[in-house]
Amino acid sequence: VHYLEKSAAAENIYPESALELANHNKHNPDIAISYYKLYAKHKPSQRTMSYNKIENILFDNQQYDEVENLYRELLENSFDGFALNRLVDILLEKNEVTDANDLVDRFMKSNHACHSIRLNKLKLESESFEVRKSISSLCNEMIKDEIIK
């Protein structure tokens, strides 16, 4: 564990060290979450897995508002199609449709050429729960297949 911690604290970290430490610290949610975030940052192609693990930890610990905060924080720092899709879903679950629309419109104006923005706009225009769910699933599958540069 000591060598993993040393590797995770290095300037050029080995991302797998952060993942191992997250798994090792699963009994301590805050530490595990910090390592999953570190892993996602340094291995973007695996970020959706990390975010899903973080969501599960937060739900297991009944920290539901923190799930929303996670995705808001990610979107403040930079654009992430997965974070946008999940945050829109969360806002819709809370029936905060205006906030969801404002969020999507903000990214539509920023000219990000990501399919998630347009698909989420389409999702918001639908009243059907099944259609919304299908669009969310489509977004997530497309995002899993993309490679971040």
Which residues does each predicted region cover?
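Alpha-helical repeat scaffolds
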Residues: V1-S7, D30-K41, Y64-L75, V97-S110, ...
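Short coil turns that delineate tetratricopeptide repeat
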Residues: N12, P44-S45, S78-F79, H112, ...
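Generic L/I/V-rich hydrophobic alpha-helical segments across diverse proteins
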Residues: Y35, A83, I90, V104, ...
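Register position in tetratricopeptide repeats
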Residues: N25-H27, D60, E93-K94, E127-S128
